[in-house]
Amino acid sequence: MSSKLRLGVAGPVGSGKTALVQALCRRLRDRLQLAVVTNDIYTQEDAQFLTRSGALEPERIRGVETGGCPHTAIREDCSINRAAVSELEHQFPGLDLVMVESGGDNLAASFSPELVDLCIYVIDVAAGDKIPRKGGPGITRSDLLVINKIDLASFVGADLGVMEQDTLRMRRNRPWCFTNLRTEEGLDRVEEFVLQQIPN
């Protein structure tokens, strides 16, 4: 039996993908049936982090070692991820949401529609305020763009106003939000978005 929603979470290394998955698990686990698949190139570091932090029960988390380019495992040949998702859906019938976190990648990363229904793309302010205007599928076509680490703007000389203007121009009417996932600022917007996507 398939889950109600398969949600991809992508973005560059260190942008806050795992922090977002962890925060959503904590917010939603008492209301929804959840599972997570994480991707790392040579380790299962993100899966182990989620397990250690108690985001979900260990059996609801699968770590995939891609062994190569991160976007290949979520786009060109996503069979290893599809197998992990199917395994979770078989083990836990009635899942509401399976989150698939990609390995850290560049702005060209995108998920295969065979793997996920929707994608959240995470970037961070520390990479500079020019990132939104650089474009790429994650910036322009993701279902939700999350601009994380807004608390670091003053330390790296990033202008949130510039980022907002560029994001509005690049995304037109597609949703996006600023977050500081360490304090959960802006997380309500992400949670609301996810809940709206899950079929009744």
Curated annotation (Swiss-Prot):
Location (main, coarse): cytoplasm
Residues reported in the UniProt entry to bind GTP: 11-18
Disulphide connectivity of cysteines: none
Assembly, per entry: Homodimer. UreD, UreF and UreG form a complex that acts as a GTP-hydrolysis-dependent molecular chaperone, activating the urease apoprotein by helping to assemble the nickel containing metallocenter of UreC. The UreE protein probably delivers the nickel.
Organism: Synechococcus sp. (strain CC9311)
GO biological process, one term: urea catabolic process
Protein name in UniProt: Urease accessory protein UreG
GO cellular component entries: cytoplasm
HAMAP family xref list: UreG (MF_01389)
Transmembrane segments: none
Keywords attached to this entry: Chaperone, Cytoplasm, GTP-binding, Nickel insertion, Nucleotide-binding
GO MF term list: GTP binding; GTPase activity; nickel cation binding
Family: Belongs to the SIMIBI class G3E GTPase family. UreG subfamily.
Protein task: Facilitates the functional incorporation of the urease nickel metallocenter. This process requires GTP hydrolysis, probably effectuated by UreG.
Pfam families named in the record: cobW
Top-level taxon: Bacteria
Underlying gene: ureG
Subcellular location: Cytoplasm
Family annotation (InterPro entries): CobW/HypB/UreG_nucleotide-bd, P-loop_NTPase, UreG
